[in-house]
Amino acid sequence: MAYLRSSFVFFLLAFVTYTYAATIEVRNNCPYTVWAASTPIGGGRRLDRGQTWVINAPRGTKMARIWGRTNCNFDGAGRGSCQTGDCGGVLQCTGWGKPPNTLAEYALDQFSNLDFWDISLVDGFNIPMTFAPTNPSGGKCHAIHCTANINGECPGSLRVPGGCNNPCTTFGGQQYCCTQGPCGPTDLSRFFKQRCPDAYSYPQDDPTSTFTCPSGSTNYRVVFCPNGVTSPNFPLEMPASDEEAK
């Protein structure tokens, strides 16, 4: 009987190990509430200051993104709106957020047995962020940051309530969005790159903005407002509603 129990426990551990490639811990250190969003897994979660949310990411997860929504107000059914990062007026996101929103992007257990991950400002900026492996191993497997006061310094042409849009969102076209083939940085994309050199500043900013870790070697952590206190130019929360993420 003991053998059967131990075999069953081993099976469960092996199943969990096989199923989940990594856990992603999302933490809010901002002095205001952030409504975290995660697709294609996770959905959404309200995070008051100091709260965390752990997402179990399966092997093969790709095109995944995590972002923070600000100035949200949801009813008990999880319907409402957010000033930045809104995903169709629902708490539990199934699609991408409306710019501007700082993105943590990742794909797990991809070619060459690597996890690929980055911070992207291609959808603009709303909240400072770090994205880090919990077990860094050197090379391109280390913490990355975007913690500059981009909202406070945002060019007037890109400034919107609660954030700073990327020029691709604002102006569109090949020059800013690389819609018809290769393109390079512009003066406006350099504004983002100079302040957050780890992050994507335009769609083809790959060489300095993509990071990798050996698959299965580490979990990951995303922190909103890693320095704890943000500039007054960052948004303050709206009055809390009665909703709570399930």
Curated annotation (Swiss-Prot):
Record keywords, A-Z: Disulfide bond, Signal, Stress response
Family membership: Belongs to the thaumatin family.
Disulfide bonds: C30-C225, C72-C82, C87-C93, C141-C213, C146-C196, C154-C164, C168-C177, C178-C183
Name of the protein in its database record: Osmotin-like protein OSML13
PANTHER family, per the entry: OS03G0233200 PROTEIN
Description of what induces expression: By abscisic acid (ABA), salt, salicylic acid, wounding, and fungal infection.
First and last residue of the signal peptide: 1-21
Organism lineage string: Eukaryota, Viridiplantae, Streptophyta, Embryophyta, Tracheophyta
Matches recorded under SUPFAM superfamilies: Osmotin, thaumatin-like protein
Superkingdom of the organism of origin: Eukaryota
Pfam families: Thaumatin
